[in-house]
Amino acid sequence: MIEVSAVAGYTPSVEISLTPREAPQMTKKLFVKTYGCQMNVYDSERMAEALGGEGYEQVNTPEGADMILLNTCHIREKAAEKMYSELGRLRPLRDANPDLKIGVAGCVAQAEGEEIMRRQPLVDLVVGPQTYHRLPKMMEAVNAGEKALDTDFPEEDKFLNLPKARATRGPTAFLTVQEGCDKFCAFCVVPYTRGAEVSRSAERLMAEARDLVDRGVREITLLGQNVNAYHGAGDGGTWGLARLIREMAKIDGLDRIRFTTSHPNDMEDDLIAAHGDCPELMPYLHLPVQAGSDKILKAMNRKHTAADYIRLIDRIRDARPDLHLSGDFIVGFPGETEEDFQATLDLVETVGYGTAYSFKYSARPGTPAAERTGQVSEAEASDRLQRLQALLTQQQRAAQDAMVGRRVKVLFEKPGRNPGQMIGKSEYLHSVHVDGPDTLRGQIAEVEIAESKTNSLTGRLV
């Protein structure tokens, strides 16, 4: 096996299909399967671009592919086992085509490393999230019959070593502005799989944003494991996320900006103000709190209290009263009592969420919480999850029902399942269905909401 760094010198799954960048003799087929967060979606796009320069054209199914790449997530329990199960399902394809190349990327690749190849010898390549710019060099080794492994945290900026993206775009795009996390929440593997917080330069981000707009993008979502910790070099100084958003808002043709995911402790005054004074910044915010009990928040190493979080939400809503708030919650964290869980329910009642995601705690190897006593039983955690989800679903339903009769601006992205139907996103990130022509794709149109459904809204063009 070759470790490339030593020889080179240089969120549910989403399947992504891209039009490849221009390259001669595109004869090889690449299938990418993406698990986990939006950043993995962005990373998959860039990996496909990097391999496009090696003659790979992306396809929508693994059958008939010359290379299959699994871009993995390590946040939830059994993520590694799910990956191994998927690799097992690929065995018949390798048996049918011995020349098929199989690679594993992402956070499970970072965490498991060489163990992946030991357990599944059919894997040719393992690459971490900080080194996928080295994929072309790794493929040289693979094509020579070697195994290739690279899970370094290199000093060089991977974004400087990737080809310029040339794929045709839809009207929305992700743009990674920051990677890694320094918060070290007791339950989280991100600091170990993504590394320390690193911000990209403002100049390069502005250039990439302009390029996206030139290729048809009207809405950009800025990504980071802790995106509001962004502090990138710009104009001889340092830009925070608010400055970056305001400067991007000046780009002609960029109508909408979002960002995710944030930590409450990095919600600076200027970023709060931007929610009120920057119309291009959409009234949607994903701001996880994880728990409502101060005891559990301290055990999680969140470094804020429930009251701190509630005051912060009040300030943001003062700046943007129509804000659609989203959050994350973990139930069954070690040491959580029924009283602690009730504090979480109380916080949800106090704050009110338009959307939220809740999970049972799952011990991640190598994290402080995994070694703690007081683990909550599976039955109790499941019961708490059901009760929390019932409350959050009630709030989401009420928020969606309140949209009926209102007019919203929808950026249309794609046709719906039914003929003559188009689907887009409102300012509040609601999925909105209308009857309309395909020419709506990429356009922003006013829609009056007529009906609220489980996870979407329907309306009519105004």
UniProtKB/Swiss-Prot annotation:
Species annotation: Jannaschia sp. (strain CCS1)
Name under which the protein is recorded: tRNA-2-methylthio-N(6)-dimethylallyladenosine synthase
InterPro entries assigned: Elp3/MiaA/NifB-like_rSAM, Methylthiotransferase, Methylthiotransferase_CS, Methylthiotransferase_N, Methylthiotransferase_N_sf, MiaB_methiolase, rSAM, rSAM_horseshoe
GO terms for MF: 4 iron, 4 sulfur cluster binding; metal ion binding; N6-isopentenyladenosine methylthiotransferase activity
Named cofactor requirement(s): [4Fe-4S] cluster
Limits of the MTTase N-terminal domain: 28-144
Disulphide-bonded residues: none
Key words, A-Z: 4Fe-4S, Cytoplasm, Iron, Iron-sulfur, Metal-binding, S-adenosyl-L-methionine, Transferase, tRNA processing
Matching Pfam families: Radical_SAM, TRAM, UPF0004
Binding site for [4Fe-4S] cluster 2: 181, 185, 188
Subunit structure, as described in the record: Monomer.
Residues that coordinate or bind [4Fe-4S] cluster 1: 37, 73, 107
GO terms for cellular component: cytosol
